[in-house]
Every structure is written in structure tokens, then in C-alpha cells.
């Protein structure tokens, strides 16, 4: 696990060009960003595994997605020489329709339309429909389910606000394959006066 979570020293740790542009837009829109070190670490972890089915919960404006597309479907000639371990299917869950349009453009820019898709629903709707589909088709293999999410999930990245992160993480464990991976930012540690104990 330590190797999986360690920094990839052979990989350029600078922000990919497309992700950098999206980050600038986020700053202008006052949208909070994951720290660059966290985005790079998520990308580094994803470079070491070969997930069949992956999902990003909380696509936002596509900032973290751009980091992962740069890994899995590089568009520059320099990155084009690298071996990619992209998933067979990737679903990006984002309830904001305008953000979904931006993510859809990102998918097309990276020529990932045959394996990546954005779903314009909130996570609670997606998980409810998926669990319902699994329950009503209990006799068939998970991979044959007709659901928004490709099953079973081998990689889940939760990129939501701290208030929503815990509930999303708890609900996703039911869908993760044995040996699958769930990546999310740990809760912020309280600082200052915490009151009487």
C-alpha cells in the first residue's frame, strides 16, 4: 500500500496544460481546488493500477478529470509515448448541467468518447438507481446490469465537498469490487479552540 500511495518520482509533477487552464477558470469563479499535491497523488495512484471500471463522483468543472485524462488518454506527443492503463469505462458524475457540458468537451478533446461518459445526476440518484437495478437483477452477473455505472467498480474517486464526501464514500463501498480502490481527501483536522472536552 505504501508503494501504491507514494509519489511517482519518474513522472512530471507539474500540472497538465489543460488542467492548468481549468484551474485558472476555477480561481476566477471562486471554486475551491484540491491541492496540487493531492491531484498529483491521485493521478500517481491511478497510474499504478489498471481499473476496468472507474467512476469520479463530483466532476465539478473537470479539473481532476483533466489530470486523469492526461494520464489515460494523453494528447501531447511527449505523453503519447507513455504506456496508458486507462479503464475500459469511466463515468463522471456531476449534477450541474453546465459543468457537464464542459466535461463533455473535455472528453471529446482527449478523444475519450468511446470509454468515458459524464452523467448529469447527483450521486444519491445514481447510487439509488444502481442498487435498485442490482436488486431487481440479482440472478445475473453484475457486468451485465443495465445501469448508469459499469459494474463492478474497480476505482472510485470522490471529489465532493467535505459535507458530502462521507455519505458518498459510505454508499460506494457496496459497489466496489473486491480489491477495488476508493480515493478521497481525508476530513479537515479542526484547529484552534475546540471547546471543553
Residue locations for each model-derived region?
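Conserved class I S-adenosyl-L-methionine
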Residues: 50-61
